[in-house]
Amino acid sequence: MSTLHKVKAYFGMAPMDDYEDEYYEDDDRGARAGGYSRRPREDRFEEEAYGYEGHEYDEGPAYRGGYAERFADEPRFEGRMRAPREFDRPAPARLGAMRGSTRGALAMDPRGMAELFEAGSPLAKITTLRPKDYSEARTIGERFRDGTPVIMDLVSMDNADAKRLVDFAAGLAFALRGSFDKVATKVFLLSPADVDVTAEERRRIAEAGFYSYR
């Protein structure tokens, strides 16, 4: 295309098709020869002016699909539940330690026991009964009627039967002019009229744990 036609095309005096086709001639020839399409005019100007050889991009990190691949490099979570190590396991208790003596209010004090129940003491012939239900109230009444101090251990009874037996023993002690005293939780002492048990002696009975062993 002549220079005059270019000027006319620039000022709108001639169609632009011929003007634009000039810049695609090389690409058209390449498309016919090699089978590739024409490129925009701007890319050709940049390549010709600055020696630009095409778009280049920095390769980013490759996509890693899947949940398992995403966390493959991360340290695996160690669960809280784990088998105990040898030094974590408590040493088994010795049988002798499990059979250790009773402490506290139920501990037996042999010396105190001897003083309380030595021969000639009013409590020397004391007996301990551990009824399982209310049907054993008769045995308690017979022992008490014979003049024997009776310790009633009601720990193994349910509360309903224990309450009935307590009411029976209290009425029995009142009828025979004896005394009825609480020694420990669900443990009571029935004393005949001729046996005087002081508060100190009741405390020592509870501390010595006599009712648990006799």
Swiss-Prot record:
Gene3D superfamilies per the UniProt record, alphabetical: SepF-like protein
Keywords from the named record: Cell cycle, Cell division, Cytoplasm, Septation
Region (Disordered) residue spans: 25-51
GO biological process annotation, one example: FtsZ-dependent cytokinesis
Cellular component terms (Gene Ontology): cytoplasm
Pfam families: SepF
Biological role: Cell division protein that is part of the divisome complex and is recruited early to the Z-ring. Probably stimulates Z-ring formation, perhaps through the cross-linking of FtsZ protofilaments. Its function overlaps with FtsA.
Family classification: Belongs to the SepF family.
Subunit structure: Homodimer. Interacts with FtsZ.
Full protein name: Cell division protein SepF
Organism expressing this protein natively: Mycolicibacterium smegmatis (strain ATCC 700084 / mc(2)155) (Mycobacterium smegmatis)
Lineage summary: Bacteria, Bacillati, Actinomycetota, Actinomycetes, Mycobacteriales
